[in-house]
Design a protein with these regions (language model features):
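Conserved beta-strand hairpin/beta-sheet module of binuclear metal-dependent hydrolase folds
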Residues: 1-48, 119-131
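Core dinuclear metal-dependent hydrolase active-site scaffold
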Residues: 7, 18, 97-123, 127-128, ...
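Active-site HxH/HxHxD metal-binding segment of metal-dependent hydrolases
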Residues: 12, 27, 34-109, 126, ...
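Divalent metal-coordination and catalytic microenvironments
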Residues: 19, 31, 56, 68, ...
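Active-site metal-binding loops of divalent metal-dependent hydrolases
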Residues: 32-33, 57, 81-82, 113-114, ...
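Anionic-ligand binding patches
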Residues: 122, 130, 162-173
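Active-site-adjacent loop/tail segments of enzyme domains
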Residues: 138-164
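Accessory terminal helices/loops
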Residues: 155-165, 174-248
Length: 248
């Protein structure tokens, strides 16, 4: 079976994702950051839309739900926290599986950025759609969750196969790279940062990355090494606090 991932930029720094199970022709959209952009891409590709898979309740992830559903008739799926804010037809919980044709999406708990944030892992495609939990060389701010919750979510993602492609929701990588360079002198971090800066100079995306790259260079996954002597979630919290105030 084959899953085609169509990635496109939208809003100021978001990425939209249309994913198509080629065996059935069924298509899903990961989040609805920009309804107009999503509908334009669907029209350009000649695809219909069957499902929306929300990761969390923020408007740049679920704000297009109503317009996209009205235009396509798709089914809206997402975590309970989206309900009451934006339309949802079916509430998903961690541990569930969503089927798109022959492709299975495993629903993973990934709270911390928001309390009920979820991610989607597609074993057959070696892909994870992680919303605002894990970024290339970074992670999401904790608007609602605790450091312990966010650290547990990051460890859950880090347990996926190393070859997993990480599709995050924003192009924040250059900024994240500057912070990584400030806190980690590992040569692998320097090499990756240089590659990121060069890619952005060429106008190229830095997403997706692989989980192996993140485990080797992402300071938030390396927090216990970078802040030794602290419990892992406290080491993570210290780095996240530094990043929140970083102006590099």
């Amino acid at each position: 079976m084959t899953l085609t991932v169509h990635q496109f930029p939208c809003l100021s720094d978001n990425y939209g994702y249309l994913v198509r199970d080629e065996s059935s022709g069924r298509t899903a959209c990961i989040d609805t950051p920009d309804a107009a952009a999503i509908l334009t891409e669907l029209g350009r590709l000649g695809w219909g839309l069957d499902l929306v898979l929300n990761t969390h309740w923020h408007a740049d992830h679920a704000g297009g739900n109503a317009e996209v559903k009205a235009a396509t008739g798709c089914e809206l799926l997402g975590p309970a926290e989206v309900t009451g804010r934006f339309p949802v037809d079916r509430v998903l919980a961690p541990g569930e599986t969503v089927t798109l044709g022959e492709t299975e999406f495993q629903v993973l708990e990934s709270g911390g950025h928001t309390l009920g944030h979820i991610a989607y892992f597609v074993p057959s495609a070696g892909a994870a759609f992680v919303g605002d939990t894990l970024f290339a060389l970074g992670c999401g701010r904790m608007f609602e969750g605790s450091p312990a919750q966010m650290w547990a979510s990051l460890q859950r993602l880090a347990a996926l196969p190393d070859a997993t492609r990480i599709y995050c929701a924003h192009e924040y990588t250059a900024s994240n790279a500057r912070f990584a360079l400030a806190v980690d002198s590992d040569p692998a971090v320097k090499a990756r940062a240089e590659a990121v800066f060069a890619a952005r100079e060429r106008g190229e995306p830095t997403v997706p990355s692989t989980l192996a790259e993140e485990k080797a260079t992402n300071p938030f996954l390396r927090a216990p090494r970078l802040r030794p002597g602290l419990p892992p979630h406290e080491a993570f919290a210290a780095l996240r606090s530094e990043k929140d105030g970083f102006r590099g």
